[in-house]
Amino acid sequence: MRTLLISLMAVGLFAASSCVNEGGQVFGELPEGVVPGSGEALEARGAVYNKDLNELKISWRTTPDPKLYKGVEVSFQALGGQSKTIRIMANPNFSSSYDYFTVVTKNPATVQYRCIWNKESGEEVSEWASADNLTVTNVASSDVFFDIVPPTFKLVTEDNVSAQVAEAYDGIVGKTDEEKKAYYTQILQIVLSSIYNSIVDAGQQPVSWIKCILGKMDYPGAVAYVSGDSEGPLMRLSSEYVEQVSTGAVSMEDATFEIRGVLIHEFSHLVQKTGAVGSNQPSCIEGMADAIRSACGGVTDANRISGALNAGVYYDENRKSGDTPCPYVWQMPYGTSGYFMNWLRTYDGDFLRKMTITIEKMGSQWSLEKAVQYILGENYKMEDLWNEYIEDAKSENVG
């Protein structure tokens, strides 16, 4: 399957007169008057569905003439169940936007798309094509990043951890050292797959060494955090939280979900780009980590919806004070901006990967607003997007 995955991902698109699947089925002729650059038919190579991220990636066979190809219009069922019709435009800022497009959905069969073409007299579109007619390969993030070199793990259980707590910990992350290392590696793989396209982008060994500690927390109420000591990076997991499992105060199911989500957030800090952005842009650091957590399925729907509906007013002068001014709600850290950034994948399934590129590219000039316009286009206004995000959350809350 890995060979098939690599071949599916290393494809492009050529300019064309119709949309067809691998079997040659024609979905729609281009409108009269559109002259394709190569005279060939526009053909979808196939599709890859990442079940961890709910991402359907449809790749074209050969790269099109950028003078003719403008992008695709896509109709699909969004993660919240809403029916959406959006445009994913070819963007010169990202050459890959001419090779494929990505849709975030739990129901790939609902995805329909039509090509948008440039013409002297105006814009033309093809007829609708259905992803349901494509060959879809289902993958996990571990398939995409199967060839990373895992970190060297140092596993530590502190002496003050009781046997009962250690046993509960084993039930969540694995009984043997090898099982624990595999668990942490899978967390790292899903984080990497949410913000990087490939190991080439992320690096062969993005994290070379990490100490994973089960012990008491320095910060009351925290479940886990990532820091460092003289040996290098470390991740500390709360034995107090795990103790609630051993006493029955927290179910094993809830603890397993929560610990996975927290570790996704913390491992994000090991591999995310921060560049010259600095801590005065909390949405870039803590917001991004929660965006990754949400994208990777580490947040309950109830918490995600509540985070949107209780985010506060769109603009508040009182939030201008302090070292990290956040007058706009989408500037705020953690889930307030993070769940919104994850929702922006509605408009481009590669949004978080492209945002990683903007963080490196823009450095100290980065802002979420600039990143959105760089990725989606200047016609996308933050307040309009935020309002739609809140309306989607309200529709889910009613449902």
Which positions does each model-derived feature cover?
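C-terminal motif of bacterial Sec signal peptides marking the signal peptidase cleavage site
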Residues: 15-18
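Solvent-exposed loop/turn segments flanking beta-strands in beta-repeat/beta-sandwich domains
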Residues: 63-83
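Zinc-dependent metallopeptidase catalytic helix centered on the HExxH motif
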Residues: 224-307
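Pro/Thr/Ser/Gly-rich low-complexity, intrinsically disordered linker/stalk tracts
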Residues: 23-67, 124-142
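Auxiliary, metal-adjacent structural segments of Zn-dependent hydrolase domains
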Residues: 174-240
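Solvent-exposed serine/threonine-rich low-complexity stretches and specific carbohydrate-binding patches
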Residues: 84-94
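Beta-strand-rich modules
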Residues: 102-123
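Pan-zinc metallopeptidase signature
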Residues: 331-399
